[in-house]
């Protein structure tokens, strides 16, 4: 389905984007190592800061390997879903598209409900029960039949040698007699079946409406989180730059610089995750209102 295709596609894009984040983080740590090494060489600080920075560089290398593995697994999963060779490389976006606006929940929600297969199945069951009641009622209604019957006889009344046809037209009226309440019990059973089918339709309608409203709420919340994490990302980037400048000036420790780098990296990860969640919430909402199924 298109819903599953969206999941595989955007997950592959997100994992690919996380590789760039890991690469950027490693580059940032590498720059810190160079700064610390220079300060050690001029004997401005001891080697402890350099050891701390080099350990973080190893951690950054490890994270980069992990993100590349995750990206490759996501790529293979996308290829498998698309039915292409594992060695093929499908073209994808370099980053998850950030959704900033959501599809409004219009007044046409009732149309969205009636387009769902669950609703149509429940409605068809009502029509089926109503047809069954009509068939059952027909057994107890008077039935009028008209027919023609004929025969040949020889000789005729005028003593001719040819066969003489004789026709008879008849009419028959069948009236069902009292059957010990069978008609009433049959109609009651039919009415009960129709009422149950109508209740099931109402339940299906309520369930679909709740699903649509919940999907729309999650979609809206996901958009808000994209905006929030985007704001945090901008602040975290600025904080890292300030921490590095203050470290060069000797005003903060290396731990504060590394923490600022980690906060920036986490802000990037959160931003990508929020963008991915928004795309998933969007496709969930579209499926709930049947947009995707209509395209299939």
Role assignments for model-derived ranges:
Residues 1-111, 218, 222, 264, ...:
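Periplasmic alpha-helical coiled-coil/stalk elements that build and connect Gram-negative outer-membrane
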Residues 3-20, 38, 74, 121-136, ...:
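Amphipathic alpha-helical coiled-coil segments
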Residues 67, 117, 197, 274:
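Metallo-beta-lactamase
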Residues 9, 145, 170-172, 216:
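Membrane-embedded beta-strand positions in outer-membrane beta-barrel channels/transporters
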Residues 108, 167-173:
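Hydrophobic, lipid-facing positions within transmembrane beta-strands of outer-membrane proteins
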Residues 1, 16, 120, 127-130, ...:
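Small/polar (Gly/Ser/Thr/Ala-rich) solvent-exposed segments
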Residues 86-88, 92-127, 177, 205, ...:
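Bacterial Sec-pathway N-terminal export signals of envelope proteins
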Residues 78, 171-175, 274, 285:
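Residues on the lipid-exposed face of transmembrane beta-strands in outer-membrane beta-barrel proteins
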């Amino acid at each position: 389905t298109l819903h599953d295709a969206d999941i595989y596609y955007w997950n592959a894009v997100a994992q690919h984007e996380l590789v760039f984040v890991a690469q950027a983080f490693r580059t940032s740590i590498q720059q810190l190592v160079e700064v610390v090494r220079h300060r050690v060489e001029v004997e401005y600080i001891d080697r402890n800061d350099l050891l701390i920075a080099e350990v973080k560089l190893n951690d950054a290398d490890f994270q980069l390997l992990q993100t590349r593995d995750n990206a490759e697994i996501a790529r293979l999963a996308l290829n498998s879903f698309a039915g292409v060779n594992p060695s093929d490389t499908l073209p994808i976006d370099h980053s998850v598209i950030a959704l900033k606006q959501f599809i409004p929940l219009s007044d046409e929600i009732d149309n969205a409900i009636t387009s769902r297969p669950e609703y149509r199945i429940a409605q068809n069951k009502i029509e089926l029960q109503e047809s069954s009641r009509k068939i059952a009622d027909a057994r107890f209604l008077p039935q009028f039949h008209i027919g023609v019957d004929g025969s040949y006889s020889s000789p005729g009344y005028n003593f001719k040698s040819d066969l003489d046809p004789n026709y008879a037209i008849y009419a028959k009226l069948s009236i069902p007699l009292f059957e010990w309440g069978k008609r009433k019990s049959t109609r009651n059973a039919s009415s009960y079946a129709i009422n149950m089918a109508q209740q099931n339709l109402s339940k299906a309608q309520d369930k679909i409406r709740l699903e649509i409203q919940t999907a729309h709420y999650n979609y809206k919340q996901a958009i808000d989180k994209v905006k929030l994490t985007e704001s945090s990302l901008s602040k975290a980037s600025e904080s890292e730059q300030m921490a590095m400048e203050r470290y060069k000036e000797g005003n903060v420790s290396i731990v504060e610089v590394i923490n600022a780098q980690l906060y920036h990296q986490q802000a990037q990860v959160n931003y990508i995750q929020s963008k991915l969640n928004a795309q998933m919430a969007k496709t969930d909402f579209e499926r709930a209102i049947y947009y995707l199924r209509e395209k299939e």
